[in-house]
Amino acid sequence: MENDTGWSVKKCIDIFGEFLLVSIHCILYARRLYPQDLFIKARKYNTIVWQSRHPILCEYIEEVVQSCIEELQTGSVHQVALSIINKEQREEERYVFSTDSIPIIPDFLLEKQISTNEPFTDAYVEYMRASLIQLLNITNGLPLIEQECTWTLRVTLKDGFPRPKQWEEWFLPPQARETDATRQFKGITIPVRNVDIGPMMTEIWVEKYTNSD
């Protein structure tokens, strides 16, 4: 049973996973990847967010995030990114969430309290509120995407870890696969407010692709 009096790695990851899920819904709404009438207003982290009401899309997002959470529990993930891809399979935008601070530990320690000196608090809610508000302001201020695009969730692994096979098969379009070590993003980078989840710190930023080579 998860310890409710202190922070555990699993608790940090679960809270991050929920934040990632909410962020994906908001980004898909703001960037108009689906008709906006498929989304409804909801409240999360003491602010207004947007949530898809289409059951198939909701199920898919939950499946993708759950697979991401399972990989995060191994401590192998450097960062998670929602990537918006155009019809030519070129990346238009990337929304990046760093996860470097998640340690590599045995499974049996995932629910163990990290430190008795750092009790569990809900202070992270305010970080998430501020970050989501800023993220929505940034996405709403970006130029509209002029053509039909799709999206995928990418994981970049820490050095020395192979890419999980299921990420190749399920979530990465064949033409969009990349070698993370050789990828150089050409465009602008917009920082978003960091989120602290207890001992876990997540940096967030937006990368906007430009057509210049």
From Swiss-Prot:
Residues annotated as domain HORMA: 10-206
Pfam family for this entry, one: HORMA
SUPFAM superfamilies, alphabetized: The spindle assembly checkpoint protein mad2 (SSF56019)
Keywords on record: DNA damage, DNA repair, Mitochondrion, Nucleus
One Gene Ontology cellular component: nuclear replication fork
InterPro entries: HORMA_dom, HORMA_dom_sf, Mad2-like
Gene3D superfamilies (UniProt xref): HORMA domain
Cell compartments where the protein resides: Mitochondrion; Nucleus
Subunit structure of this chain's protein: Forms DNA polymerase zeta with rev3.
Function: Required for DNA damage induced mutagenesis. Involved in DNA repair, mitochondrial DNA repair and translesion synthesis. Has a role in the bypass of abasic (AP) sites.
Similarity annotation: Belongs to the MAD2 family.
Protein name: DNA polymerase zeta processivity subunit
